[in-house]
Design a protein with these regions (language model features):
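Short conserved beta-strand segments at catalytic cores or DNA/RNA-binding microdomains
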Residues: 1-12, 19, 46, 72, ...
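Mobile-element integrase/transposase regions
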Residues: 1-14, 23-26, 161-178
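Active-site beta-loop-alpha junctions of metal-dependent nucleic acid enzymes
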Residues: 16-44, 219-223
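RNase H-like two-metal-ion nuclease catalytic core shared by retroviral integrases
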Residues: 47-48, 59-60, 80-102, 118
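Active-site-proximal acidic segments at structured loop/helix or strand boundaries
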Residues: 98-197
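Protein C-terminal end segments and domain termini
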Residues: 203-354
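Acidic/histidine-rich, metal-coordinating catalytic segments
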Residues: 41-61
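RNase H-like polynucleotidyl transferase catalytic core
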Residues: 68-70, 74-91, 110-112
Length: 354
């Protein structure tokens, strides 16, 4: 992974984020996340001579910026300049920050279940570093100095959308191809043109203004990201193909276990289960299945799942406060009527004797 780091000149405020590559998308996203974190925009940024910022060298000291950098500068309104070649004194500040943050963050922990978790951890480490008192800044920390600097910074802008947008045709496998990797969409869209937004870690697909697919981006060659729910119509026509399908290979491991335990030779019912999941959500369905396992582990069916889901829905309805007020008023009226009725029948007996 590539590490992007921003460091302020005065207060040494540090922001870092990991990306899959060092390309224009990651370069632009790093700025967007940095300014979003700050809540403001620095008026001037100084860059090392990296390829994603410098398109080409025009002369001994002149450099032409890339289109990606120009778009960021135009959108956020900041100015920029580049370090001079072979001038370590100009870029040493940032290079030391790279080494410092990397050592503090990953010296003792380097394995994470996902890039998202790694970035959450890295963000927490940067927050800790930014809270340290600095003797050379009168005992103030980086966050305190940043608050002073914000008075002279540019206003916050909405998050910059760095996506690369393409229009792609859905192939016969019901997938679109981005940089050699396949991503599934709804099987009814075969042959159609879909709008694809490509981010550094995400692929979003739209058809007629509606989002029809979302995938984590793949960076290997000829990798496939297949989602089961995109092929429900096809599998309904050919349920026997379910067990050995690519969609089944990439399904959630918890659902694979449910299939093995309760839906072998019941492929059509398992496909129907995915329709229920699309409506109610995976977590809710898994909770219901867990409840059914405790009651009747050998008899789990879609009908029972639907019944329990409906019960949960009814029990989760919010209490109508208006009805509660009516009920309380009714109780008070009954109490008043009760006070009018004698506790014993002695009075009635005496009245009858008279």
């Amino acid at each position: 992974f590539q590490l992007a780091i921003f460091t302020s000149a005065k207060g040494n405020y540090r922001y870092a984020r990991l990306f899959p590559k060092q390309d224009t998308l990651c370069f632009q996203e790093s700025h967007a996340f940095f300014f979003e974190k700050l809540g403001k925009v620095y008026k001037t940024l100084v860059y090392d001579n990296m390829k994603v910022a410098v398109k080409k060298f025009v002369g001994p000291s002149e450099k032409e910026p890339t289109e990606g950098l120009l778009k960021l500068s135009t959108y956020y309104g900041f100015k920029f300049r580049f370090c001079n070649v072979r001038s370590g004194n100009e870029k040493g500040h940032v290079e030391r920050s790279v080494e410092y943050v990397r050592r503090k963050a990953f010296a003792f922990k380097e394995n994470f279940i996902s890039l998202e978790k790694a970035n959450e951890y890295l963000d927490s480490i940067c927050d800790e570093l930014n809270q340290k008192k600095q003797s050379y800044n009168e005992g103030r920390n980086a966050i305190e100095i940043l608050e002073i600097e914000k008075e002279y910074m540019l206003p916050k802008m909405p998050l910059f959308d760095s996506a690369r947008i393409e229009e792609l045709r859905v192939d016969k496998y019901s997938t679109i191809v981005v940089n050699g990797s396949h991503y599934s969409v709804l099987d009814k869209l075969v042959g159609k043109i879909v709008l694809v937004k490509i981010y550094s870690t995400l692929i979003l697909c739209y058809y007629e203004g509606e989002k029809v697919a979302q995938h984590e981006r793949k960076y290997g060659f000829n990798e496939w990201s297949i989602k089961f729910e995109h092929f429900i119509s096809t599998l309904n026509r050919k349920p026997g193909a379910l067990a050995n399908s690519t969609a089944m290979l990439q399904v959630d491991p918890r659902l694979k276990e449910i299939y093995k335990n309760y839906y072998i030779k019941k492929e059509r019912e398992f496909i129907e289960l995915f329709t229920i999941i699309n409506e109610k959500g995976l977590d809710e369905v898994l909770k219901v299945i867990k409840s059914l396992k405790s009651l009747s582990p050998l008899d789990i069916s879609n009908e029972k799942i639907k019944v329990l889901l409906n019960r949960h829905k009814e029990s989760s309805h919010p209490v109508n406060m208006k009805n509660c007020e009516i009920l309380e008023n009714s109780r008070q009226m009954l109490e008043q009527y009760k006070s009018l009725i004698p506790i014993s029948d002695k009075g009635f007996v005496e009245e009858a004797l008279l």
